[in-house]
Amino acid sequence: MSREIKRTSQFKKDVKRMLRQGRQLEPLLDVVEKLQNDIPLPSELRDHPLVGNWHGKRECHIEPDWLLIYEKTDSVLLLTLIRTGTHSGIPGL
């Protein structure tokens, strides 16, 4: 069973910004599909838990300088897409 996807308003703004920068959405959509269906991500995406202000969230690399911050909630099978962007474009990373 796949997870329901919730997109934060900031994530939606981030996606628009990435499109304006000329990024293609296919790599992001591929990763989101894997996460939604609980398919393990390839090691080159460097999926890892975050600490500090981002504790409880996870980050993976869509491309070398394109990140996705997300959270999985197992009790309700929810995938929350929190932020996407570059290292310098996401405060606090």
Where are these regions (language model features)?
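Residue-level signal for threonine
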Residues: 8
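Enriched for short, Lys/Arg-rich terminal
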Residues: 1-4, 12-25, 60-67, 71-93
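PIN-domain endoribonuclease scaffold, especially VapC-family toxins
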Residues: 25-37
